[in-house]
Amino acid sequence: MTGRAAAPEFLPIVLALTTRDKGRELLRRAFTRRRTKLLLVRTAEAAGATLRTTLVDAVVVDLCAGGDDAWAVAALARQLPSIPFFALVAPRLADAAVLGRSAALEVTDLLIEGVDDAALRELVVPQAFTARFAAALRGAHAPLGLEAPLQQRAWEYVVSAGGRPVRTDAIARALDVTREHLSRSFATSGAPNLKRVIDLVRLIAAAELAKNPGYDLADVATVLGFASPSHLANTAYRVAGIRTASLTRLRTRDLLTRFCQGRSRSRV
């Protein structure tokens, strides 16, 4: 077994609305298939449907052509504050009016076409939902008693998924160990079971998304890949002893505390 870090297999998902060929070409060059999953849509309806069914890491709205749909999608930034929204504008549009309207809609940043082209990915991806989620939880393994190198590497892999479903065999492959060795070694010295930890991280992501006005609990269950809202409810009770309605007010610290109070072990 090596000491290298796990290699996450989760590409950031960027949703982009544009009606221009030039806009699509620019976005495809910036967010290549090898490094990003780019979802291109042309209408506000399609963007809204995607946001309700997929855990999107960032949204880029092409304002260069204007139009009601573009501003309608930009307005979703206030409804989904966990997801960063970026406005792609031409230099001639980067005036006080556009800046003021974008700021009022709580758009994360402006991307200037022709100026920021080569740096679009570097400007967007570090602020993506999954990147910020993983960074916020990177040190949260300590209260769980995950101090061994293998435990920490597995933890980093799990949080890198941003709350998406994670299989133990995928973690084992990334860490270059067998699934049996991983499960056995992870839960040593009273540490929680790996499967339970995966559920905890998914519940923390659900709590983050549930605080967004634009999501109801059914939406949260869908975007995080739970089989149904009932599946999310069962996970919330099993992991933290709570009802899903409590997710809108509980912080990560609260969920970690409840998890450590006797709910960190599962049958395997």
Task: Annotate the PLM regions.
Residues V98, D109, V115-F133:
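Receiver (REC) domain switch/output surface
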Residues R153-R167, F186, G190, A207-D216, ...:
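Basic, amphipathic alpha-helical hairpins
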Residues D169-R196, V223-R243:
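Basic/polar phosphate-binding segments, predominantly the helix-turn-helix DNA-binding elements
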Residues D57-F85, V89-V98:
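Conserved phosphotransfer microenvironments
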